[in-house]
Regions:
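Conserved SAM-binding loop of SAM-dependent methyltransferases across substrates and taxa
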Residues: 55-64
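C-terminal catalytic and target-recognition region of SAM-dependent MTase-like enzymes
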Residues: 141, 155-208
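Mobile active-site "lid"/loop adjacent to the S-adenosyl-L-methionine
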Residues: 117-145
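Conserved small/polar residues in nucleotide/adenosyl-binding loops
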Residues: 2-11, 204-210
Length: 211
């Protein structure tokens, strides 16, 4: 059975499932980072990858985005995200689809799709120091695929929740990804998890525009 509840964060309302959902149904570490993207989303076309229940996507919609597409590999999460879109009266603007993000981004590229903002908030690619090399490959690849979909002058909001992916390693990996897809990046904001989560220097959040 589903353990449904409602959460209200500033202007956005969420249906969550505390019984079946990940991390008690809601990722509180990202709560202020979701608010931070709002100032960049007015009239924007936004792609939110690994959207889960749509938290970043809904904040983009509330901020006045022209259109938002949220993507997640879990049909359970996508169904709840679409419920949340209706819950906030955003169903005509904020839509969610079930896809494997790694496979779906090249499909969007092949279709000639471009976005004003691409959000990447993948699950941890490593939970041990021993597998950090594979994690670096994963972050480099997903950021390459995401960057290809950002319009010139647009924004890439990219996140890592891998404890062993420290700031220097992550930024170097993002830089490598940009070089490989011939993009120039400028960091406009660096953010971490909310203050009610223990701060680790290994945990990084970046917001980058690409041209």
């Amino acid at each position: 059975s589903r353990g449904l509840g409602d959460v209200y964060k500033r202007q956005v309302k969420y249906h969550i499932d505390v019984a079946e959902g990940q991390k008690t149904g809601f990722f509180l570490d990202q709560k202020y980072n979701r608010l931070a993207i709002q100032k960049l989303c007015k009239d924007a076309k936004v792609l939110d990858c690994f959207t889960y229940i749509g938290t970043f996507a809904l904040n983009a919609g509330i901020a006045g985005a022209q259109s938002v597409l949220g993507v997640d590999a879990s049909q359970f999460a996508v169904d709840l995200a679409n419920e949340n879109s209706k819950f906030n009266g955003l169903e005509n603007t904020v839509k969610f689809e079930c896809h494997d993000v790694f496979d779906f981004l090249p499909e969007l590229e092949a279709q000639g799709e471009l976005f004003d903002m691409v959000i990447l908030d993948p699950p941890a690619f490593t939970k041990s120091r021993a597998s950090i090399k594979n994690a670096i490959k994963g972050y480099r690849e997903i950021n390459m695929r995401g960057m290809k979909l950002v319009k010139d002058g647009g924004y890439l909001a990219t996140c890592s929740c891998s404890h062993f992916m420290d700031y220097d390693t992550f930024t170097k990996t993002i830089g490598q990804a940009a070089k490989l897809v011939h993009k120039r990046l400028r960091q406009v904001e660096f953010r971490t998890q909310a203050a009610d989560h223990p701060i680790s220097v290994s945990y990084t959040h970046l917001t980058l525009p690409t041209t």
